[in-house]
A protein has these predicted regions:
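N-terminal J-domain/J-like co-chaperone modules of DnaJ/Hsp40 proteins
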Residues: 1-40
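J-domain helical core
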Residues: 21-37, 50-75
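Short, surface-exposed loop/turn segments at secondary-structure junctions
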Residues: 42-50
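Short, charge-rich amphipathic alpha-helices with coiled-coil/heptad character
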Residues: 76-81
Length: 81
């Protein structure tokens, strides 16, 4: 399954809750970026480079949203709408 099909909480393997384990979020973020960062795909096809960029951007957006309490609460409201 593509990460792009997961909600932000699912990407990091955490429950959609207001209080989250920030250390786990940080650790998982670094792991995901080490796997999907576009720099890892320098010798890949243009399609693979494009997909890596999309996935990396999605991971960044997810991380930035979940690391901020106000944005996290807003996101929880969005996905439970």
């Amino acid at each position: 399954m593509s990460l792009l099909n997961l909600n932000y909480f699912e990407i990091f393997g955490i429950e959609a809750e207001i209080i989250i384990d920030i250390e786990h979020l940080n650790s998982k973020y670094l792991t995901l970026q080490s796997e999907f960062h576009p720099d890892k795909f320098v010798n890949a096809s243009n399609l693979e480079k494009s997909m890596a960029t999309r996935v990396s951007t999605y991971i960044n957006d997810a991380y930035n949203t979940l690391s901020d309490l106000v944005e996290r609460v807003d996101y929880i409201l969005q996905i439970n709408n």
